[in-house]
Amino acid sequence: MANVLVVGGGGREHAIAKAMMASPQVSTVYCAPGNPGMIRDGIRTLAIDEMDFAGLVNFARANTVTLTFVGPEVPLAAGIVDYFQAAGLAIFGPNQAAAQLESSKVFAKAFMSRHHIPTADYRQFHELDSALAYSHEQAVPQVIKVDGLAAGKGVTVATSHEQAAAAIKTAFKTSSTVLIEDYVAGFEFSQMVLVGGEHYALLPTAQDHKRLQDHDRGPNTGGMGAYSPVPQITPAVIDQTIATIIEPTIAGLKADGLSFEGVIYVGGILTATGVQVIEYNLRLGDPETQILLPQLQSDFYQVIVDLLQHRQPHAQWQTTATYLGVVLAAPGYPGPTEAGVPVPTVAGADYASVAGTPDQLVSAGGRVMMVTASAPSLVAAQRAVYQQIDQLRVGDLVYRTDIGAKGMTATHD
């Protein structure tokens, strides 16, 4: 029987750990650092920080961990995979060189240009005045991006030149390189794929909701909810995404000498002229993972082991239901949040920034939990989730009431 270590402590890692626990080959799932909400599902949490690579390697060796799965982007960008590989331990995730596809927007844009992968035109700037001058000459809307990792909050779609100038000034406070990108109109979606060398397993499509408030108002967040599959993303669109983006990305990594075992997450947009890449992430999305992995009907542990050994995995996904999840966050999110706010306990939820005990959880950060449901249609799945939330004592926690609404423009219950 196998022991699995999941690195991270959020709702995504809770879902990954539950999927690993469902494997008949797995005896124990550890999560470092995890959170108290995970303990409710029999996951063993560890007092080891996700950036303490030496501590994680020592634990993996001492507890005969056969597979480590990395959830968040920050340890990947810092080289956790290289560290584990140097210690001879099996780990699923991109090495530090490949992780630049997410950790540097400039690296990603150059990669897409080199390998003819469709994406918006852009210019990069290293000093404020030239960026402001260029922005002023361009039409709006325009997209301002920080080069490095920004927890999903490093992008501004500016609808006026004044807003663009303010975003550029803010961006240069945290980054030495800023990108100004042409705005592309279309329908956004997430397409993730588990990759091992030239082999891959495609996940169902998903759409997350980045803005804090209903009708896509308010500030950007890490994500306030998601649903899957996305009705507007037809089999023909998926085929186009595979042919023009996913397979060229996998081939491009190989051509550039970047060995790859991990997740490629395409933040895609369906435009009038086809699918384009908005951004790459090299890890599973949060909150999408929480409504994607429950759709897997195969052994998740075996899928990952096969990919690590560069074998084609058997990954079967359900095709008859829609899965939908709503994130609940502490008051103040995505700004400074109130700690110690009571968080309801409910079976099946995925917990994130919580403290306390498994039976008495309290907020310890921004997003605290995600409530999910599945049903034969998107409308029914949405209804089921909000009925669950209505029965919880959510108190001062904040959440959106319209998750899934975008998908309904193409569906009827």
Curated annotation (Swiss-Prot):
Binding positions (Mg(2+)): 279, 281
UniProt cross-references to InterPro entries, sorted A to Z: ATP-grasp, ATP_grasp_subdomain_1, PreATP-grasp_dom_sf, PRibGlycinamid_synth_ATP-grasp, PRibGlycinamide_synth, PRibGlycinamide_synth_C-dom, PRibGlycinamide_synth_C_sf, PRibGlycinamide_synth_CS
Superkingdom as given in the UniProt entry: Bacteria
Metabolic or biological pathway, per its Swiss-Prot or TrEMBL entry: Purine metabolism; IMP biosynthesis via de novo pathway; N(1)-(5-phospho-D-ribosyl)glycinamide from 5-phospho-alpha-D-ribose 1-diphosphate: step 2/2
GO biological process, one term: purine nucleobase biosynthetic process
Cited PROSITE patterns: ATP_GRASP (PS50975), GARS (PS00184)
Enzyme class, spelled out: ligase
Family: Belongs to the GARS family.
HAMAP family, per the entry: GARS
Protein name: Phosphoribosylamine--glycine ligase
